[in-house]
């Protein structure tokens, strides 16, 4: 799994992680956040590598489906992009400080 995919899955997990089963959360944590191999995760959980892959694939599919329907991450990234553009357009220091505070909170 490449870095870009892990970053995207981490973002999806942050938004939709609570919709996953405990097992799916655990496998996302091990595979994506801790960068363990399917074999390592399987050994830790006493399941096969194939079971790890299957559970991860189902978790990813579930999160992608939710994002496709709800578009929460897409909207969040849109707001962040608009604030960043607004920051570039303004010369008002007070406004820039407020925008930076908002961006930090996001």
What residue spans do the PLM features occupy?
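C-terminal flanking helix
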Residues: 60-67
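Helix-turn-helix/homeodomain-like alpha-helical modules used for DNA recognition
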Residues: 80-106
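Residues within the DNA-recognition helix of helix-turn-helix
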Residues: 55-58
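Short, Lys/Arg-enriched N-terminal segment that forms or immediately precedes the first helix
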Residues: 4-16
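Hydrophobic positions on the alpha-helical face of helix-turn-helix-like DNA-binding modules
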Residues: 28, 41-42, 52
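Short amphipathic alpha helix immediately N-terminal
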Residues: 22-34
């Amino acid at each position: 799994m490449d870095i870009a995919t892990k970053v995207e899955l981490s973002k999806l997990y942050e938004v939709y992680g609570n919709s996953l089963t405990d097992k799916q959360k655990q496998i996302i944590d091990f595979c994506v956040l801790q960068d363990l191999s399917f074999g390592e995760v399987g050994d830790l959980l006493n399941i096969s590598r194939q079971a790890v892959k299957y559970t991860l694939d189902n978790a990813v599919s579930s999160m992608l489906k939710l994002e496709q329907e709800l578009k929460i991450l897409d909207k969040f990234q849109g707001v962040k992009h608009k604030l960043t553009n607004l920051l570039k357009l303004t010369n008002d220091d007070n406004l820039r400080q407020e925008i930076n505070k908002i961006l930090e909170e996001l």
